[in-house]
C-alpha cells in the first residue's frame, strides 16, 4: 500500500518575494491559505502526448488503442468506465503509468502550458501561504516542465502518487503538514477522480473544464467551483 509522503514545508526565493510583493497589493479576499494543483491537463497540456505514448504501449499490454475520433467520448467516462472501455486490468495500471511517465520525460520540456495559466499561477501565488502540486505523474517530470517554463520556484512542493485512486490520502497529508482546516485548502483538477478524491478528503475542489473530463461530467459531481478558462481563477479573489 502506498503511503502519503512526509511533506516538508519549504520556502523558495520566489515564494518570499511573492509574499513581500503582496504588501503592495490591496487586501486579498482569498479565503484559502493553500492551493494544490493537479498537473496533467490542469497546468500542462500533456493529453495529446499522453495518448500518443499510451497507443505505443497498448500492444505490450494487450489493451485497446485510443483513436482520435473517440477522445471526446472518453471525456464523459468515469475512471472505472474508462478502464473497462480500454480493457485495462487494474493490476496493470501501475506498470502502465510507470512506463508511460518514463517515456514522457523525454518530451516533457517540449510541451506547452495551458494557455493563460502562467499569469494566473503567478498572480494566485501572491495571495496564499503555500502552493503545491499533487499528481499521478512523477516529481521529476513536473520539476523539468516547471523549470522549463520558469515556474518551479513559485511552488513549495510537488507530491506524487502512482495510484490512480490515491490522491485522497495525499490531500489529507498535505493538510496535516500545513496545519490547515479543511476549508483553508483548495485542490484544483481536471478529472472526475480529482473531484472524488477531494470530496473524500473533505477538501474543497475546483474542477477545470479544459482537461480530460468534460464539463458535463464534472458538474454532475458537484465540485465547489467550475472554471472554464484560466482567468476564472480570479473569482477566488472576489468577495464570496
Language-model features and meaning:
Residues 34, 168-195:
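Conserved Lys-Pro-Asp/Glu-containing loop-to-beta segment of HAD-superfamily phosphomonoesterases
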Residues 70-71, 152-165:
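A short, structured active-site edge motif that brings together acidic residues
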Residues 106-133, 139-143, 168-169:
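Short, acidic loop-to-helix structural element flanking the phosphoryl-transfer center
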Residues 64, 89, 151-156, 181, ...:
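Conserved H-loop
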Residues 1-37:
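Non-catalytic pre-domain segments flanking phosphatase-related domains
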Residues 30-118, 125:
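N-terminal helical cap/lid subdomain that shapes the substrate entry/recognition surface
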Residues 118-126, 175, 195-199:
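Surface-exposed amphipathic alpha-helices with a cationic face
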